[in-house]
């Protein structure tokens, strides 16, 4: 999966102690590396190869873009072309007639230097709403880059209708071979074939240049196969395929608007540690594990400023009275999943933001990565007052966490047990958020829940 040729013997991409690829200007790419010693080779020469996102080894017949006598600090400059925005540069030696990579291939890590449509970021309230400030961006439906409405956040989606932009391991023809089938709702995008890369890059470049969107979310709850379908392989391969798409999307977007932000999206499953063999092991990977693997893969090929979009729904979605689970089937189990940190809701958002403060998860500048809560709806199934109190609590959770930049409410969902539409008290509470009336409903919500301080229910 993703590997197009067989790796040579003793392939060691970790040989180099560092490597990077950056734009010096709009015409020149600088590639540098640091080696611990001169590598053994057939000819004493270092070769630089251009590689596609889906290539993880270099064919013996590949033609290098540059070469130089071996040294401890090799440095190359190569011309920038539009296609090199989406390819990697790999450092290799000849060994036994094979091209052996001695460093992790590197993408251009500063695509924003190319941006010609950079826009100042808009002042954003903490609270926003799906359908008003947020839209789903279905690929191949916006090929001209024109989006009606003045949205600021878009979630990039693939409904599977266009097989060219759908990952080869997500297409209808291969689904019967899935050893652990799920019911797909959306599909992995295709950064494993040239045509898919070109289509994705072209469309997202136009949208980034021509729309008001400044936050782009690549996929919906991508730690769950239902929402980003690919046949079962293993989680490392799955995340690698997603990472390839994310890179293409990131460079397409940031090379147009340097102030745009690009996010990976996870759901509530945080640290459940389902073992192999458990049915759920094949359905989702914990958000924490997904981010750890994704971050390592991205950093190895040139760290970039990705962010996290999380969906902090209550657990379960069908029950909004989170402070009293006595009326919820399996309420004790559900409450324990949250209190133990296995599931993440607005009650325990610090799980995510504390994790993102660890050294290995910081952005290239050393900052904590951008965090938005891109979808949450509170059911009215337990009554509008319960819905109103839970709604206010979710807002307080976002407001009190210094790393959460936005919470985006889904207010139009209407299924029998998960109806997030507002009325009466819940509408009044929602309207107050971010206004002078907010304090009035703060007191009401605490009294309704039966607490004196929000720290009693929000961590």
Predicted regions and their residues:
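Aromatic-rich peripheral "rim/lid" segments of glycoside hydrolase catalytic domains that contact
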Residues: 103-106, 117-124, 171-180, 217, ...
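Noncatalytic carbohydrate-binding groove/subsite architecture in carbohydrate-active enzymes
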Residues: 239-385
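Structural preference for beta-strand elements that scaffold enzyme active sites
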Residues: 131-136, 149-153, 214-217, 259-263, ...
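N-terminal substrate-binding region of glycoside hydrolase catalytic domains
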Residues: 30-32, 52-64, 69-218, 222-237, ...
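Solvent-exposed loop/turn segments flanking beta-strands in beta-repeat/beta-sandwich domains
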Residues: 38-51
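Aromatic/hydrophobic beta-strand junction motif of beta-rich domains
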Residues: 26-40
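Conserved, mostly hydrophobic/aromatic
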Residues: 207, 216, 221, 249, ...
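Short, compositionally biased P/S/T/A/G/V-rich stretches that sit at domain boundaries
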Residues: 1-25
């Amino acid at each position: 999966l993703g590997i197009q040729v067989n790796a040579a013997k003793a392939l060691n991409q970790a040989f180099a102690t560092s490597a990077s690829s950056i734009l010096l200007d709009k015409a020149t790419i600088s590639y540098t590396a640091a080696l611990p010693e001169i590598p053994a080779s057939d000819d004493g020469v270092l070769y630089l190869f251009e590689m596609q996102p889906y290539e993880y080894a270099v064919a013996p017949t590949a033609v290098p873009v540059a070469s130089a006598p071996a040294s401890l600090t090799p440095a190359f400059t190569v011309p920038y072309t539009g296609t090199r925005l989406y390819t990697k540069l790999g450092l290799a030696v000849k060994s036994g007639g094979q091209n052996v990579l001695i460093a992790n291939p590197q993408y251009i890590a500063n695509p924003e230097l190319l941006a010609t449509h950079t826009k100042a970021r808009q002042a954003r309230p903490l609270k926003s709403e799906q359908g008003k400030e947020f839209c789903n961006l279905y690929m191949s439906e916006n090929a001209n880059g024109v989006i009606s409405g003045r949205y600021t956040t878009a979630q990039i989606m693939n409904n599977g209708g266009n097989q060219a932009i759908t990952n080869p391991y997500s297409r209808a023809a291969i689904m019967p071979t899935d050893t652990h089938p799920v019911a797909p709702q959306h599909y992995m995008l295709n950064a494993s074939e040239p045509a898919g890369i070109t289509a994705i890059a072209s469309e997202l470049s136009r949208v980034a240049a021509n729309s008001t969107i400044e936050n782009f979310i690549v996929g919906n709850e991508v730690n769950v196969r239902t929402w980003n379908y690919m046949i079962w392989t293993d989680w490392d391969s799955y995340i690698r395929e997603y990472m390839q798409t994310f890179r293409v999307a990131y460079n397409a977007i940031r090379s147009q608007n340097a102030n745009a932000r690009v996010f990976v999206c996870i759901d509530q499953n945080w640290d459940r540690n389902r073992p192999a063999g458990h049915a759920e092991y094949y359905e989702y990977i914990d958000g924490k594990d997904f981010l750890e693997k994704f971050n390592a893969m991205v950093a190895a090929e040139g760290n970039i400023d990705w962010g996290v979009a999380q969906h902090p729904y209550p657990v379960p979605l069908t029950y909004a009275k989170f402070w009293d689970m006595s009326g919820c089937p399996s309420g004790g189990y559900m409450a324990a999943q949250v209190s133990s940190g296995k599931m993440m809701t607005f009650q325990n958002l610090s799980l995510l933001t504390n994790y993102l403060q660890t050294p290995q998860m910081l952005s290239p500048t050393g900052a904590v990565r951008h965090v938005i809560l891109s979808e949450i709806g509170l059911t009215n199934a337990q009554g509008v007052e319960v819905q109103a109190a839970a709604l206010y609590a979710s807002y307080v959770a976002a407001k009190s966490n210094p790393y959460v930049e936005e919470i985006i409410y889904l207010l139009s969902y209407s299924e029998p047990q998960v109806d997030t539409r507002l009325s009466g008290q819940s509408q009044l509470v929602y309207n107050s958020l971010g206004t002078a009336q907010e304090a009035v409903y703060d007191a009401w919500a605490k009294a309704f829940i039966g607490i004196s301080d929000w720290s009693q229910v929000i961590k």
